[in-house]
């Protein structure tokens, strides 16, 4: 846009086809030679690297615009094709038009009344802002039904499309063996008691003279169309064969040139902007050099872009075509060269068309042509526009650090010195800015660059840092290192929801990994088995302010998906709070102080009592209560099934475990967040994590093989339960083989047998689990983890200690394998438990080779299912994001798209954020408390609050209302 020119608002954008003349007009040069560079290494004129198409080499000037490399965006050229070729992108549309228009007069095969009706449909569709392609499809479908042109009366033939770019006109003609077909159909058929048809009878049925029938039967006369159809009807024979006439691109172009413009308008095509003959190319645009740059290899040779390779092929075949045609070569050679030219133009457009061999390098690698540059994950749209590589980002492995706040992230010092934030120098921060510059790029906190007021950027080095520091004045900008407290954005892929990218505060730390508090793992779906995460350093104050207010971790404690907390205590934290509060253990003063020393609590509450020795003690409930807000009152059923009672910030009853403080909807965290705010919730979660870690270290908590080993007596009871199940299964099999097994309603006998065997073996596993569970104490580490909800379940413990159980594929016992048996270790048609995937061993005792094989079969199904679901859900999510990305909630509360169409009159139909709604019927939000908290944060005095609430001040003098006021005051 030139200076002083006012910007204009775009009313609409319409797409159309380009006229060959437009290709020529925008072209900087005609390309006629396939050579690129001369012997001296300079681009050849009218070649594919002509300087008029743009320049990529430093020092050269573009001969079209005069700009140097970097300033010139490049210019198109063109190739004059020796013969028309079909644009493969329009092959389906070409087929539709060939089938819907007359082969003689090229008019649309619809009557004038039908055309008017479709024009009205188009106007109505456009006024409703709907897609007009459905109307066009309906018009072509209607036109295809006509076998005669309603305008010129010409007979119409079907058009067959042989992908990608070959078209045939299919005509039904009289078969060469028509007389034999008639004679064969007239013969008697003994199987169907058919006496056959004599020539005299055929003549009577068809009203054809008997002499003519005899001439037809002898092959002396070829019947006309009316006679042929009459004979076919009489004897039920087909006397025709398909005659396929290939339509050359030049024929199709001539056909389309004759289509009237008003007929195109009935199909929704603007004939001024898009003529159908332009889909058959006579001129091929050549992309600018900047779109297909060549590179220089280490040995000095140039390597050309894939598009340039393809254009070389097109020019060479084009030249051969012209030379052979001018030399009068046979038609067969001309058609072969034409097909070859069509192939090269097709693969230049798209090198992944099914049924067409891809163009390849000498190495065998397929060329990456125009379509491949645009589509797919690595293409222009998804790879370069929607997502791209950015500066000011870092990526490394993550490690856990429970000493950090959930708002913080540990950043390696090496990253902190490489990443910078822009600091605008003023009077207040001048000395600090100079100190950063003086420290240089190596010292931390230092600076890497400074920007002068005139916009010039100067790199800070060890040599010039002292001098630069003295020159820094207000108005300069310093690109300083990241320091503690800086706000950055942290992300883990795949980014499936909003909380996959959140803002953290920097804590610069040694070593090379990002450090993260474990309570922040659930929203990122992160673990520490090698996961990597991305960090982005924000570059301006607006971005940093928005991130701090909207994206900080403490603002994401409640999930917008289900309205409950997604951040909370996990795994070891839950085991720690369980040990601290289960059975309400007692602690002496030293132990109680040690438990609370990493929290903000600086003094112990009053002791709960004294023991037999007269020493004071504090309880687990009492210590946990120190973390709760003073006015918190709750009562609900907890993880372990007992009732949790909290009154005025004191835990009176219950055990604190997953449902109380864990992630994904715990009562205490959810309530504190909604009633007391995100800051108080963040403090609570941090302190619960610290207290839980101290508790788990106090009690001691470890797990090993011995913790899952059952006693000899328990092992014998488990073996008895499994043997009893085996005996029951054998009885079922014998009953089935004797034919005495009754089928269940709606089931076959085979299905009934399988169901009963599965039920029997399922009960055996449950019995083994019950025995194993009885064998373990309540303080067993695996039992603690299962009961508290920290990790795993009693089923996992059952399989570790008792019996793994039946392995299933697609919900059934394992039946696949060899013929009539699952493995070669079993007899054919063996229906026993062992032969169909029952694993009687536990993980502790170890699986036999046969059991291991069956177990792997069951596990594979889970892996495959996970992979399939991941790819499907990822594709669906991307489709939804693309479809919904333009929707936006406006200031009037409506949800609208970019064309201002109202999608919802109120966001979510109720105008309510899930974060603000209580999802638990048992726990109501204390609305008054929330209102008081908001008012206290907004107003400094009670007078301001009263003005806001429009509460009238009580009278201050004892007038007529004085007595009434005194009474009210006494109350």
UniProtKB/Swiss-Prot annotation:
Residue sites binding Zn(2+) 2 per the record: 102, 105, 149, 152
EC number, as in UniProt: 2.7.7.6
Enzyme class: transferase
GO BP terms, alphabetized: DNA-templated transcription
Pfam families in the record: RNA_pol_Rpb1_1, RNA_pol_Rpb1_2, RNA_pol_Rpb1_3, RNA_pol_Rpb1_4, RNA_pol_Rpb1_5
Signal peptide from the UniProt entry: none
Cofactor: Mg(2+); Zn(2+)
Cofactor info, note text: Binds at least 2 Zn(2+) per subunit.
InterPro entries, per database record: DNA-dir_RpoC_beta_prime, RNA_pol_asu, RNA_pol_N, RNA_pol_Rpb1_1, RNA_pol_Rpb1_3, RNA_pol_Rpb1_3_sf, RNA_pol_Rpb1_4, RNA_pol_Rpb1_5
Region (Disordered): 185-204, 951-971
Keyword entries, A-Z: Cytoplasm, DNA-binding, DNA-directed RNA polymerase, Magnesium, Metal-binding, Nucleotidyltransferase, Transcription, Transferase, Zinc
HAMAP family: RNApol_arch_Rpo1N (MF_00863)
Name assigned to this protein: DNA-directed RNA polymerase subunit Rpo1N
Organism: Halobacterium salinarum (strain ATCC 29341 / DSM 671 / R1)
Encoding gene (name): rpo1N
């Amino acid at each position: 846009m030139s200076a002083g020119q006012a910007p204009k608002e775009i009313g609409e954008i319409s797409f159309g086809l380009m006229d060959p003349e437009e290709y020529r007009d925008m072209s900087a040069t005609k390309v006629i030679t396939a050579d690129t560079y001369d012997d001296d290494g300079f681009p050849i004129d009218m070649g594919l690297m002509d300087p008029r198409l743009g320049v990529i080499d430093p020092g050269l000037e573009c001969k079209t615009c005069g700009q140097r490399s970097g300033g010139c965006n490049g210019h198109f050229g063109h190739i004059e094709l020796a013969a028309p070729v079909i644009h493969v992108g329009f092959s389906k549309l070409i087929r539709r038009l060939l089938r819907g228009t007359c082969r003689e007069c090229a008019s649309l095969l619809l009557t004038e009344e039908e055309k008017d009706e479709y024009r009205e449909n188009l106007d109505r569709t456009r006024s409703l802002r709907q897609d007009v392609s459905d109307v066009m499809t309906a018009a072509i479908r209607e036109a295809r039904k006509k076998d005669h042109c309603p305008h010129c009366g010409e007979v119409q033939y079907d058009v067959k499309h042989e992908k990608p770019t070959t078209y045939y006109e299919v005509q039904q003609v009289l078969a060469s063996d028509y007389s034999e077909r008639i004679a064969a159909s007239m013969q008697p058929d003994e199987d169907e008691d058919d006496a056959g048809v004599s020539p005299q009878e055929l003549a009577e049925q068809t009203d054809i003279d008997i002499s003519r029938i005899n001439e037809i039967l002898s092959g002396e006369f070829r019947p006309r169309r009316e006679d042929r159809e009459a004979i076919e009807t009489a004897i039920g024979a087909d006397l025709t064969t398909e005659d396929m006439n290939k339509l050359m691109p030049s024929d199709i172009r001539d056909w389309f040139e004759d289509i009237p413009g008003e007929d195109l308008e009935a199909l929704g095509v603007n004939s001024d902007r898009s003529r159908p003959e332009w889909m058959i190319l006579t001129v091929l645009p050549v992309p600018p050099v900047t779109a297909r740059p060549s590179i220089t290899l280490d040995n000095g040779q140039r390597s050309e872009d894939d598009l340039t390779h393809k254009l070389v092929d097109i020019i060479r075949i084009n030249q051969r075509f012209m030379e052979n045609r001018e030399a009068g070569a046979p038609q067969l050679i001309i058609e072969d060269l034409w097909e070859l030219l069509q192939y090269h133009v097709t693969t230049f457009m798209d090198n992944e068309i099914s049924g067409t061999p891809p163009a390849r390098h000498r190495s065998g690698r397929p060329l990456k042509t125009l379509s491949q540059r645009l589509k797919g994950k690595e293409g222009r749209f998804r790879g370069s526009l929607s997502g791209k590589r950015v500066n000011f980002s870092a990526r490394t492995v993550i490690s856990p650090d429970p000493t950090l706040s959930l708002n913080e992230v540990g950043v390696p010092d090496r990253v902190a010195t490489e990443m910078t934030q822009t600091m605008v120098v003023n009077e207040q921060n001048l000395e600090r800015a100079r100190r950063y510059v003086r420290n240089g790029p190596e010292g931390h906190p230092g600076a890497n660059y400074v920007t002068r007021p005139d916009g010039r950027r100067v790199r800070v080095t060890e040599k010039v840092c002292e001098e630069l520091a003295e020159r820094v004045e207000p108005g300069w900008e310093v690109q300083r290192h990241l320091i503690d407290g800086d706000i950055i954005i942290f992300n883990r892929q795949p980014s499936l929801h909003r909380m996959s990218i959140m803002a953290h505060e920097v804590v610069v730390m040694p070593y090379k990994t990002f450090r993260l508090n474990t309570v922040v793992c659930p929203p990122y779906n992160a673990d520490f088995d090698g996961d990597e995460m991305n960090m982005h350093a924000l570059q301006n104050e607006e971005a940093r302010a928005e991130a701090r207010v909207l994206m900080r971790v403490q603002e994401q404690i409640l999930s917008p998906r289900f309205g409950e907390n997604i951040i909370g205590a996990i795994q070891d934290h839950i085991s720690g709070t369980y040990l601290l509060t289960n059975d309400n253990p007692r602690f002496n003063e030293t132990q109680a102080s040690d438990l609370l020393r990493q929290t903000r609590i600086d003094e112990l509450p009053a002791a709960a009592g004294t023991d037999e020795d007269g020493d004071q003690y504090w309880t687990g409930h009492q210590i946990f209560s120190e973390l709760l807000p003073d006015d918190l009152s709750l009562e609900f059923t907890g993880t372990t099934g007992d009732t949790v009672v909290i009154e005025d910030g004191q835990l009176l009853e219950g055990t604190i475990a997953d449902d109380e403080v864990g992630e994904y909807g715990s009562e205490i965290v959810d309530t504190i967040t909604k009633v007391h705010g995100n800051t108080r919730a963040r403090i609570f979660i941090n302190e619960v994590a610290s207290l839980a870690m101290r508790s788990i270290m106090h009690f001691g908590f470890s797990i090993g093989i011995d913790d899952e080993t059952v006693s000899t007596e328990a092992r014998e009871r488990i073996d008895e339960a499994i043997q009893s199940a085996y005996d029951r299964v054998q009885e079922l099999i014998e009953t089935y083989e004797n034919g005495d097994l009754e089928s269940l309603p709606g089931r076959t006998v085979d299905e009934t047998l399988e169901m009963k065997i599965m039920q029997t073996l399922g009960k055996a596993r449950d019995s083994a689990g019950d025995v194993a569970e009885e064998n373990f104490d309540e303080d067993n580490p695996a039992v603690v983890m299962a009961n508290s909800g920290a990790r795993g379940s009693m089923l996992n413990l059952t399989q570790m200690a008792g019996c793994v159980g039946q392995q299933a594929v697609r919900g059934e016992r394992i039946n696949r394998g060899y013929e009539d048996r699952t493995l070669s270790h079993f007899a054919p048609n063996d229906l026993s438990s062992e032969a169909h995937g029952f694993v009687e061993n536990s993980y502790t005792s170890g699986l036999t080779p046969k059991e291991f094989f069956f177990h792997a079969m069951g596990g594979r199904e889970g892996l495959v299912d996970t992979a399939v679901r991941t790819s499907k859900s990822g594709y669906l999510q991307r489709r939804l994001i693309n479809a919904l990305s333009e929707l936006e909630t406006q200031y009037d509360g409506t949800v609208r798209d970019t064309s201002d169409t109202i999608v919802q009159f109120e966001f979510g139909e109720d105008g309510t954020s899930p974060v603000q709604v209580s999802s638990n019927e048992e726990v109501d939000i204390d609305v008054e408390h929330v209102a008081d908290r908001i008012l206290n944060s907004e107003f400094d005095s009670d007078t301001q609050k009263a003005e806001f609430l429009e509460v009238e001040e009580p009278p201050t003098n004892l007038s007529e209302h004085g007595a009434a006021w005194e009474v009210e005051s006494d109350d």
